[in-house]
């Protein structure tokens, strides 16, 4: 009888997966961009009552950081998570978020980048459906010696990527560009003396074994991420599935920011307890000196992209307003 009722559609049961989506990501599975991917998969499958099945591919097994965006456009993966910050100049609206403006947390920056993209609908993202946006936590300094002043950082070999390398150069350090995965060996061999990144990597990549000092309040930059879907795949989805995905877009940005901010706190607690890592903060007067050196980066962004027809002043004004608004809303 149950079989008859089910066949007649009179009893509700989880639907057979009718729609399969492939989701590519580039960092290793335990890292926060992949944790947010698994959370999104679980929620979409649950909220569509099993109608959608999402197959996830972490660790560059399907697409890597360099071909992620083009791979999604080409349909190699239905969905992909890319670090827009890794491609300077390709995503100029989002790039405003990566400037050195002292983001207090990943949550504040993640909700801000989502709102910014929603408002400006950047033409560089027109070929895809934007599923969500988020950032890593603010980048701070993990090092083999205490960094308490500009003098301490002068000529000091620190790994950074994208905008971070430019920031370190301006501050007088000796930036070394390399992927996060190469850092442990470079630290071990003394090729670099530290790393400038969000602090969850102290535990995730075990940098606390080498970097016994952290300067935790410089908040130099964030790395922005976009999760995008192949446009044809999106267009082919039924309306009820589209609604589930649309309803999760901002929610996922908030969830990811809060998850990784909490993860930073856990990682720092672990680093202090397990490896006796010493955490320092710069006094405001010293911090002001650092940011005074970095101000020209804002001017350069304004001029360079304004010359290309982007309303950069309005974009930066909005970024600062969003930062102020969400800093209050999501105060630590």
Protein language model features and the residues they cover:
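Bacterial N-terminal signal peptides
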Residues: 2-9
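Intrinsic disorder/low-complexity segments
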Residues: 9-10, 140
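P-loop NTP-binding core
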Residues: 113
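Sec/Tat signal peptide C-region and signal peptidase I cleavage site
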Residues: 11-17
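N-terminal secretory/targeting leader peptides
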Residues: 18-108, 116, 123-332
